[in-house]
């Protein structure tokens, strides 16, 4: 009976994986057909959100803080996978395979250190009402570039997305070590990043967090803390992101003399 149950589980998992693969392949095939007439070299960064499979609302994470855009590890992965699937031409800068993404995340973690992962990307979308406004043609289930008097009409809007998130939701102890490994911060415009600052919600304000360096953070109380991330760009602009982490009091070590009294 146990063997049958095991085989059944393996069958279900395999069937689900194959079904998911077939769905992804079918979607990609449809998108390739629909967008095939377009000149892909005109797409900013070679990433078109309208072309990809959207796992989450990427434009919402545009560097402006809102109540609905707190980040976590799941949101980070969903945004990355959406951008990965939105590559309309062969661009590789800032990207790794989903398998490498998970591997990097796994091996970047260190005992007693909270690691952060994130991304900063530029990508494109169709402008609103592009077909109505004469910027794009849609005919026979396909998109076509629009030309007016021989002049190409630009239907694209370049956008930015920035997220950072801790790999843990709960931490025990008031003294924390935090690290942002460069191996799990992805960007197709990394040269635009000047610095990253974090307000850990402990009353100390923003502190600069360099890649691959330990930053010590202290709290005086338990509770859910909001970590606010600030991405400073070389253009002098700043983008923001934030996440939550629950801080719990850790074990308190009592000196031997206090536990057993004065032996003198």
Question: What is each residue range found by the language model?
Answer:
Residues 1-22:
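Bacterial Sec-dependent N-terminal signal peptides
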Residues 20-264:
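Extracellular/lumenal mature domains of secreted and surface-exposed proteins
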């Amino acid at each position: 009976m146990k063997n049958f149950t095991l085989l059944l589980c393996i069958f279900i998992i395999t069937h689900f994986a194959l079904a998911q693969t077939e769905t992804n392949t079918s979607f990609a095939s449809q998108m390739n057909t629909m967008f095939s007439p377009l000149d892909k070299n005109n797409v900013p960064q070679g990433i078109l959100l309208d072309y990809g499979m959207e796992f989450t609302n990427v434009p919402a994470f545009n560097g402006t803080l809102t109540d609905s855009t707190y980040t976590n590890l799941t949101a980070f992965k969903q945004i990355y996978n959406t951008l990965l699937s939105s590559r309309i031409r062969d661009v590789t800068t800032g990207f790794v395979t989903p398998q490498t993404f998970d591997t990097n995340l796994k091996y970047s973690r260190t005992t007693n250190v909270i690691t952060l992962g994130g991304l900063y990307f530029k990508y494109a979308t169709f402008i609103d009402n592009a077909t109505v406004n004469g910027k794009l043609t849609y005919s026979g289930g396909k998109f076509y570039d629009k030309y007016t008097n021989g002049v190409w009409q630009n239907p694209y809007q370049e956008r930015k997305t920035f997220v950072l998130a801790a790999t843990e939701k709960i931490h025990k102890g008031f003294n924390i070590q935090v690290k942002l490994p460069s191996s799990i911060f992805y960007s197709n415009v990394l040269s635009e990043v000047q610095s990253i600052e974090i307000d850990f919600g402990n009353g100390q304000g923003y502190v600069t967090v360099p890649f691959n360096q330990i930053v010590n953070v202290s709290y005086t109380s338990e509770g859910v803390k909001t970590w606010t991330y600030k991405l400073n760009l070389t253009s002098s602009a700043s983008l923001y992101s934030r996440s939550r982490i629950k801080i719990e009091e850790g074990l308190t070590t009592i000196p031997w003399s206090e536990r057993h009294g004065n032996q003198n």
